[in-house]
Amino acid sequence: MGPPAMAFQALTLTPLPFSLHSSSRRVRVLAVAADQTPPPAPPSEPANSPSRLLRELAQRKKAVSPKKKHPPRRFILKPPLDDERLTRRFLSSPQLSLKALPLLSSCLPSAPLSTADRTWMDEYLLEAKQALGYPLAPSETLGEGDDCPARHFDVLFYLAFQHLDPSSERTRMRHVRNGHSRLWFLGQYVLELAFCEFFLQRYPRESPGPMRERVFALIGKKVLPRWLKAASLHNLVFPYDDLDKMIRKDREPPSKAVFWAIFGAIYLCFGMPEVYRVLFEAFGMDPDDESCQPKLRRQLEDVDYVSVEFEKRQLTWQDVAAYRPPPDALFAHPRLFRACVPPGMHRFRGNIWDFDSRPKVMTTLGYPLPMNDRIPEITEARNIELGLGLQLCFLHPSKHKFEHPRFCYERLEYVGQKIQDLVMAERLLMKHLDAPGRWLAEKHRRTLMNKYCGRYLRDKHLQHYIIYGETVQDRFEHNRRLRNPSTTSVQQALHGLAYCVYGKPDVRRLMFEVFDFEQVQPKAV
């Protein structure tokens, strides 16, 4: 028993063959563990046994690295396409196939439709077209040549129904997803403008407040699933769900996107008259329905005249959809102009504003535009009406509204809001061919924020020509919280007047050349 005991004693008394250099060794700990106390050594092991020291060293080396967060795959930058692939992609894209129809071309899918897309069209498109009253023949047979917009209806109508369904691989494809979102981005402003024009002509004495309530009651997001079900389209939007049993957050967003996109496609292919037909005939909307009436409010007595065509009877949607201006009409939209500018405005001809301020305003805005009229008297009459419309645009409600409710810019402001929304939406669609609808909607909202609209008017120093009531003149001129919203309203009223008198091209000219909404023109130093 002697030698083993001596060996053990020698082992414990001799120094260890390696040293730890604990003072000079730097150990980098990347994270702190919850419990760093090492497990207790067995009682039979002495404090400086090699096995214990090795175990402690191994534990100290075991540093817990923090969990790395990798970016999602959609944010990882891809290498740019080489020239050949980029050229091939652009040449095969349907978006660049139509030179004569740039807006419609920008809403076509960015890549040719796949076999899965064609399968869906073969199975369900006939049902959708029948529900809205369209011929069942393929749209490629309509018209002659690619310049006929109706020939592309099948593709756009297919995209309108492809709301993003996480369980469907087909709706997650980029060309389908972006094509659908671009259509609903356009369709929402088409609907707003359609109802705006309809209600302004149907209710010639009403202020815009009740009209907005009527529009919300007809196409608010809560009622859109009901309209889809009324037209028997709910089975195409929700093929596997019962619409009545779905909760709101699952039912309303897809219904809203599909409803808007349908009207985006119809507007691109058939124009605004077809939008009215589908709204009131296929979906069965009734503006006289009890649920669509505005809340009761104190009405100001309107003693002023309205145009003769509004006095006889209340206009229907067929009157608005079928209306074509006569060949020698003064304006691009004569009936809309007469619905917004009351005949009594002629009493303001020759007043101080007409003599002093109107020429400066017209010079700043580039009015009157050169027109090729057959008779010089038509040009003269148009310029007189344009001057009265401009005076109405600058007429603040505080001046005459209490005695004469329509002698202010409110109705022109309402139509101006809607037309500037649509013009900016069309501009963004043609400018950003690859952008999805959500990105376009955000850019649209940021560009047309109310505070910017008024700022562009103030940049041209036109705010000095606004006609306020005597009681509020000082308050508005020295308080920007009151003044700036009124300059925004005047800006939008100018767009409404430009649309009524000269049409949509003049709204584009005002927005992008005169007021430079996109802020791309060089500024004077």
Curated annotation (Swiss-Prot):
Residues 1-28 form a transit peptide. Residues 125-271, 403-503 form the RNase III domain. The keyword RNA-binding applies. InterPro entries: RNase_III_dom, RNase_III_sf. The keyword Plastid applies. SMART domains: RIBOc (SM00535). Signal peptide: none annotated. GO terms for molecular function: double-stranded RNA binding; ribonuclease III activity; single-stranded RNA binding. Coiled coil: none annotated. GO terms for biological process: Group II intron splicing; mRNA processing; regulation of gene expression; ribosome biogenesis; RNA processing. CDD domains: RIBOc. Disruption phenotype: Pale green, albino, and albino stunted seedling phenotypes. Lack of plastid ribosomes. Pfam families: Ribonuclease_3. GO terms for cellular component: chloroplast stroma; nucleus; ribonucleoprotein complex. It is found in: Plastid, Chloroplast stroma. Keywords: Chloroplast, mRNA processing, mRNA splicing, Plastid, Repeat, Ribonucleoprotein, RNA-binding, Transit peptide. Interacts with RNA. Part of large ribonucleo-protein particles that contain CAF1 and/or CAF2. Binds specific group II introns in chloroplasts and facilitates their splicing. Acts on both subgroup IIA and subgroup IIB introns. The substrates of the subgroup II also require the CRM domain proteins CAF1 or CAF2. Binds both single-stranded and double-stranded RNA non-specifically, but lacks endonuclease activity. Required for plastid ribosome biogenesis. This is Ribonuclease III domain-containing protein RNC1, chloroplastic. The gene is RNC1.
